[in-house]
């Protein structure tokens, strides 16, 4: 298809990559009054989009990268929605010689923040702007309003801000209703999105463990689970997108069997890597994030389906049947879930704070909590409390030390511990619940047993140690066999 771009109205915004997220973001931008240009490597995909979803929209398609670039007004604003890694670099390398100083590229995929750092430096050196932008909200969020986490070239963000503010999710907030803010330079946006996904892993695993205890421990039916989760979603503590969709899931019937669909879904969870990246970053920066690690590990364990089935016939465990008051235990499970959730978010925010300090991102933690209130997968009512905690005390070292969260966890730790004991007695694995409680118990202790660890290190490797009766920074070595 040929057209004379010289006589066409220039497009305000361009999208490369027409998988469902790219399509939905293009439609979102167009619906806010911005003329769009689109391009996809496969012409068939472009033609299908133009013949179906783009009909009647102010969207123009290009069938070569050169035509696509010519369609855009300057400074060109190009959103790239392709698979992370090599495909992003390939698109950038194809665009670079066609762009002019001041033009900007936005990577809206789940790219590794280190790749975004490299791309930002490379493109800024040529006079181009680069924005690595985390996009959360899934297909629906992309279309109706996602949570956006842009980082990179500040000047490029300023050009994009009027568009991003309009396409982002909108929430009730006295500071700013749009769920978008400039996260910081370089890979800051993709870093925060990575940690968002890590927290998401933690949230999902904690909910799965609560479900396991309620269903396989207390014996609740799917109808009862639907009712309980619906009630939980009305509470200040647990009101969230993930609890809301879990409520819907328990009610969904399977058209093939007539039974509940949840009972026919294989217990093997997939993952795309952002949870693993979060865990690796936590280790590299020295920030403990055990709940998130447990959640990633739980998905890995779930993938060993055939191996687990074989092991189940050989390795026995407790066979206790619950005989207590079910109604009395449901609120205890709710409290355990909330306490664990607080720990998971505390870990994620601590990791962002450390990365911000280490990489010079200057991340505004209250703003992060604000933009996660709408559009994104981890949106939850208690994010207002997280925002307030960091706004009241910008130097807060850990979310658990904020007055409200401290009191909440202290008030609920009794039921939390009871639920873990019950799970252990019944042989129900609760790795994320357990890791959360271990995190709390470790963080609140002034003295841990790592004095023995350090003594062992000095014994076999002369790694030295500090003494409790001497100032920090003085190191000692002992000849242990003398």
From Swiss-Prot:
This is 6-phosphogluconate dehydrogenase, decarboxylating. InterPro entries: 6-PGluconate_DH-like_C_sf, 6PGD_dom2, 6PGDH_C, 6PGDH_Gnd/GntZ, 6PGDH_NADP-bd, 6PGdom_BS, NAD(P)-bd_dom_sf, Pgluconate_DH. Substrate binds at residues 110, 136-138, 196-197, 201, 272, 299, 457, 463. Pathway: Carbohydrate degradation; pentose phosphate pathway; D-ribulose 5-phosphate from D-glucose 6-phosphate (oxidative stage): step 3/3. It comes from Synechocystis sp. (strain ATCC 27184 / PCC 6803 / Kazusa). NADP(+) binds at residues 17-22, 40-42, 82-84, 110. The keyword Signal does not apply. Belongs to the 6-phosphogluconate dehydrogenase family. The keyword Transmembrane helix does not apply. Catalyzes the oxidative decarboxylation of 6-phosphogluconate to ribulose 5-phosphate and CO(2), with concomitant reduction of NADP to NADPH. Keywords: Gluconate utilization, NADP, Oxidoreductase, Pentose shunt. It comes from the Bacteria. PANTHER family: 6-PHOSPHOGLUCONATE DEHYDROGENASE. GO terms for molecular function: NADP binding; phosphogluconate dehydrogenase (decarboxylating) activity. Homodimer. One of its GO terms (biological process) is D-gluconate metabolic process. The active site is at residues 193, 200. GO terms for cellular component: cytosol. It catalyses: 6-phospho-D-gluconate + NADP(+) = D-ribulose 5-phosphate + CO2 + NADPH. Its EC number is 1.1.1.44.
């Amino acid at each position: 298809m040929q057209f004379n771009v010289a006589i066409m109205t220039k497009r305000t915004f361009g999208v490369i990559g027409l998988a469902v997220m790219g399509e939905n973001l293009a439609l979102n931008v167009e619906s806010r009054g911005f003329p769009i240009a689109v391009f996809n490597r496969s012409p068939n995909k472009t033609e299908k989009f133009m013949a179906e979803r783009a009909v009647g929209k102010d969207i123009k398609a290009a069938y070569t990268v050169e035509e696509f670039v010519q369609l855009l007004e300057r400074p060109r604003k190009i959103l790239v929605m392709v698979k992370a890694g090599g495909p992003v670099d390939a698109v950038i390398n194809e665009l670079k010689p066609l762009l002019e100083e001041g033009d900007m590229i936005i990577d809206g995929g789940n790219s590794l923040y280190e790749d975004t750092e490299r791309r930002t430096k490379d493109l800024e050196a040529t006079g181009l702007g680069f924005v690595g932008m985390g996009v959360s909200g899934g297909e629906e969020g992309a279309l109706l309003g996602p949570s956006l986490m842009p980082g990179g070239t500040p000047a490029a963000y300023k050009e994009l801000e009027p568009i991003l503010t309009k396409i982002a999710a909108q929430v009730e907030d006295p500071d700013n209703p749009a769920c978008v803010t400039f996260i910081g330079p370089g890979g800051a946006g993709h870093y925060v999105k990575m940690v968002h996904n890590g927290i998401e892993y933690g949230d999902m695993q904690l909910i799965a463990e609560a479900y396991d205890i309620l269903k396989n421990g207390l014996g609740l039916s799917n109808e009862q689970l639907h009712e309980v989760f619906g009630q939980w979603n009305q509470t200040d503590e647990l009101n969230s997108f993930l609890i809301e969709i879990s409520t819907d899931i328990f009610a969904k019937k399977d058209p093939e069997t007539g039974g509940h669909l949840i009972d026919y879904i294989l217990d093997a969870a997939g993952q795309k890597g952002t949870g693993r990246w979060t865990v690796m970053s936590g280790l590299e920066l020295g920030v403990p994030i055990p709940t998130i690690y447990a959640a990633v590990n739980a998905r890995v364990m779930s993938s060993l389906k055939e191996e687990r089935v074989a092991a189940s016939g050989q390795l026995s465990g407790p066979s206790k049947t619950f005989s207590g008051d079910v109604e009395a235990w449901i609120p205890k499970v709710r409290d355990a879930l909330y306490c664990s959730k607080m720990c998971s978010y505390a870990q994620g925010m601590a990791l962002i704070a450390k990365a911000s300090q280490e990489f010079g991102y200057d991340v505004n933690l209250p703003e992060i909590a604000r933009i996660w209130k709408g559009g994104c997968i981890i949106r939850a009512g208690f994010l207002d409390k997280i925002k307030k905690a960091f706004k009241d005390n910008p130097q807060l070292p850990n979310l658990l030390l904020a007055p409200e969260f401290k009191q909440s966890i202290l008030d609920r730790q009794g039921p939390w511990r009871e639920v873990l004991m019950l799970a252990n007695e019944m042989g129900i694995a609760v790795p994320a619940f357990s890791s959360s409680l271990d995190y709390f118990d470790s963080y609140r202790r002034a003295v841990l047993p790592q004095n023995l660890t350090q003594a062992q290190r000095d014994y076999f490797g002369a790694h030295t140690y500090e003494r409790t009766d001497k100032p920090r920074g003085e190191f000692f070595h002992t000849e242990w066999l003398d």
